[in-house]
Amino acid sequence: MSKSTAEIRQAFLDFFHSKGHQVVSSSTLVPNNDPTLLFTNAGMNQFKDVFLGLDKRAYSRATTSQRCVRAGGKHNDLENVGYTARHHTFFEMLGNFSFGDYFKHDAINFAWELLTSEQWFNLPKEKLWVTVYETDDEAYNIWANEVGVPHERIIRIGDNKGGAFASDNFWQMGDTGPCGPCSEIFFDHGDHIWGGPPGSAEEDGDRYIEIWNIVFMQFNRQSDGTMLPLPKPSVDTGMGLERIAAVLQHVNSNYEIDLFRDLIAAVADVTGATDLSSKSLRVIADHIRSCAFLISDGVIPSNENRGYVLRRIIRRAIRHGNMLGAKETFFYKLVAPLIAVMGPAAAELKQQQAMVEQVLKTEEEQFARTLERGLALLDDELSKLTGDTLDGETAFRLYDTYGFPVDLTADVCRERNLKVDEAGFEQAMEAQRRRARESSGFGADYNSLIRVDSASQFSGYDHVQQHATVTALFRNGEAVDEIHAGEEAVVVLNRTPFYGESGGQVGDKGELKNATATFSVTDTQKYGQAIGHVGILTTGTLRVNHSVEALVDVVRRNRIRLNHSATHLLHAALRNVLGEHVAQKGSLVNDKYLRFDFSHFEAMKPEQIRLVEDLVNEQIRRNMPVQTEVMELDAAKEKGAMALFGEKYDDQVRVLTMGDFSTELCGGTHASRTGDIGLFRILTESGTAAGIRRIEAVTGEGAIALLHQQSDLLQDVAHLVKGDIHNLADKVRAVLDRSKMLERELQQLKDQQAAQESASLSSSAKLINGVKLLVSQLDNVEPKMLRTMVDDLKNQLGSAIIVLATTADDKVSLIVGVTKDLTGKVKAGELIADIAQQVGGKGGGRPDMAQAGGTDVQALPAALASVEAWVASRM
C-alpha cells in the first residue's frame, strides 16, 4: 500500500533525524531576512545567513518541510497552474542541510538510502537517473563507484545556459557569494510516456521527472568571476513533496496524489461541478493552499506588493469557480478541507482558521460584484478583435474599473488562443501612476529627493537637549552651504536628541539655536543613516559647520512617549483577550492620540473593548518598569519578543519589556514606568480592510480631557431632561418612550386623514370605456401615505385604475395602482413610466403597483391630464 502525502513528509523528516539532523519548523512565507524575496520559495531561504557566514545555529545538520510560494516576481508559476501536471503556486520543499558538516559522500548516500531502501521509499533502483556538473568528477565517482548507478544513467551536464558556470547543474546564490555544482535525481515513469533523459532533445517531456536536487556549496564566487574554495563546504538539498508523492503513489500528475484528490473533491462539492477532470478544479485546489497559508502568515489582499499577488491568486480562483457554475461564495469554504488534508502541517493555519475564512469571504464578495460585468466587457471586446492580441488599454480598463489583474485577463485570452499586449498594459499603468504623482499635491516634495551620505548619532533615549554641529543643509531638496531667515530647509546634525519618524511614531518638534540664529523644527525625518530636522529659519543665518543647541519640545515628546508605551500594552491586551492571531498591522503615535491597526476577523464586541481597556489600565496601575535591552535578533525572539510583520531588523535589536506583560522589538521613545501613562481610554474601534481592525485611543491628559467632555455632556443631557446623572438613563428612556407614543398617535391621525381623503376621492372616479379611472393631485399629503391611499381606494372602487401625485420640496411623487382584473390591459409600470418622463423622472414596479419621482413640478398638471387618453387607447 502506497504512503499518504502526510506519511511521506514525516518519513523524510524521520529519516534525516535518524542521521543526526535537527528537525526545523517551516519558516513563514514572508521572508524576514531577505528584502529581495517576495515570498519564501525554497527550503534554504531561512538558512541563507548561515550559508553566508552571517549567522550561527546550535546545530550543523538540519532538515525541514518548508512551505513555499512561487507567484509573482522572478519565480512565477501562476500562469501555468492548472494547465500542467506539476506547476503550483504553493508547494512543500523537503530538504536536508549541512552547515560545514558532511559533504558530497554523505549527501549522495543519504539520498540513495532514503529513496531505495525497503525501510523507507523503496523505489526501484533501475528507475533512477542522476545528473552531475560536467567537471564534478568527485560526485560522478561517488554515484558510479560507491552507490553503483550504471554509467549510462549518470549524465554530465555542462554550461548549457550561455556562460561560464551557467548550467542546470551549477547553483549560484547571486553574482557573487556561495555557489557550487549540483546533482539532480530523476525518476523514469516508463516508455509509455513521451520524453527523453536530461540533456537530450526530448528532456522537456514527462517521462523523466526531477525529484531531488542536491547542491554542493564549495566555492565563493568573487566579483571578477574567480572561484575560491569555501573553508567549510556545505550542502543544500530540495525535493518537492508533491512530486515525490506522485512517484510513490504511482500517478503521473501531482494533481492525482491523495492530497489533491481530496481537495479537488471538496472544490467540486462547494462549486457544484461534476466534471472532475476540469482544469478549473485543479486551479482552485492549488490556489486555496497558497491563499490560506499566505493570509495565515500575515498577508492581506491589497493593491500593492505581496497583498496584490495574493489578491490576483484569489481572483483567479474565483473566476474559475464562476466557470464551474458556482452560484454563491465558495472559496472560503475550502479552508476546513485544506486543514484536514494537510494534517500536522496545517497546525498554525488551524489556529487562525476563522480569520482566514473571513478574509477570503470578504474578498470574494467584493470581487463578485464586478466579475460578471467585467467578463461581459471582456467578451464584448474579444468578439470585436480582428487579430490575436488584446490591446493593453482594454486590459488596463478591466484592471482599473473591474479589478481584473492582467494575468486573469490573460487567462481568459489563453483559453481562446489569444494574447494580451502586456507591454501596452504596463504603459497605461505607468501613465496612471504619472497622473497620480502630478495631482498628488500643490507643489513638489523636495525633501523626498534628499540623499545624505553622512550619519547622525541619535541621543534621544537619554537626552532632550544636545550640543551639535550642522553637517548638511538642504533647501528645495538641494544641498546648500547656508540658509537665511524665512527660508524653509532641512538641517542635518552630527548628533541629535530629535527622534526621526519611524515605527509609527511621529518625528519630534522643537528648536535649533545658537547666538545668532533660531531654526524652528516642525518635523524630524530619517534620510538613510542621517536624521533631518525639517522646518524654517526664523532669525539669522545658519551655515554648515555651525554649532547649535538642539532643544526638543519636551511636553510634546512626553505625550508621544506615553502614547507609544500604551500601544505596546494595547497590543499585548488584544492578544490576551482576542487570541494569539492578533498581530500589529500598522500604527500612528503622536502627541494627541494613538492609532493601532491589527489583524482580527470581526468587529470587537463592546464587552471585548471594555476588557481590553480594563486590562491596559490594570497594567498602568501596576506601575511596571519599562526596560530596554540591546541583543541579537535570534536571542530576542527566543526571549519571546514580538517582531512586527513586514519590519526589517538589524542583527542587533532593541527589546522593550514592560514587566511580565509585554516584550516587543522597538526603537521608539517610551515612558519610564507604565504608571507614567496615567489613564488609557479607547475612542473608537473600526474596520479598515478585510481582516484588519483599528483602535484609536488617548492616554494621560488626553484621557482625562475625554472624561471631562463626557461628564459635561452627561450634565447637559441631564439638564435637558430635568434630571441628574444618577437617574439620567431612566429620564432619557422615558423621553424616548414618550416620543414613540406620540409618533404612533401621529401615524394614526395620518392614517385617518388618508382614509378620509380616500373616501372623498372615490366619488370623483370617471368611467373610461367601462373602467373606473381616478387621477388626482393631492396637497399636504406625505409621499409615503400615497401607497396606503391607493390600497384603500382599490378596496372602495373594486375594479379601477388609480393615479395619485403630490409635491414636496420641489419634487414630484407619483403612484399608480391597477386592480388585478385589469392588469392584462393596463400595467402600472408602463403607465407610470409615461407620466414620469413628462415630469423629468423615472420609476417602475409591478403590473398592479408602481411608483416614480420627478423634478419638474410645473409639468405635473399636464402629465396627469394625459392619463385619460393613455388609458382610453388601451381599453
UniProtKB/Swiss-Prot annotation:
SUPFAM superfamilies recorded: Class II aaRS and biotin synthetases, Putative anticodon-binding domain of alanyl-tRNA synthetase (AlaRS), ThrRS/AlaRS common domain, Translation proteins
Region (Catalytic): 1-461
The reaction(s) this protein catalyses: tRNA(Ala) + L-alanine + ATP = L-alanyl-tRNA(Ala) + AMP + diphosphate
EC number assigned by the record: 6.1.1.7
Cofactor (UniProt): Zn(2+)
Primary localization class, coarse: cytoplasm
Keywords noted in UniProt: Aminoacyl-tRNA synthetase, ATP-binding, Cytoplasm, Ligase, Metal-binding, Nucleotide-binding, Protein biosynthesis, RNA-binding, tRNA-binding, Zinc
Keyword Metal-binding among record annotations: yes
A GO molecular-function annotation: aminoacyl-tRNA deacylase activity
Source superkingdom: Bacteria
Comment, domains: Consists of three domains; the N-terminal catalytic domain, the editing domain and the C-terminal C-Ala domain. The editing domain removes incorrectly charged amino acids, while the C-Ala domain, along with tRNA(Ala), serves as a bridge to cooperatively bring together the editing and aminoacylation centers thus stimulating deacylation of misacylated tRNAs.
HAMAP family linked: Ala_tRNA_synth_B
UniProt-recorded name of the protein: Alanine--tRNA ligase
Organism from which the protein derives: Yersinia pestis
Gene expressing this chain: alaS
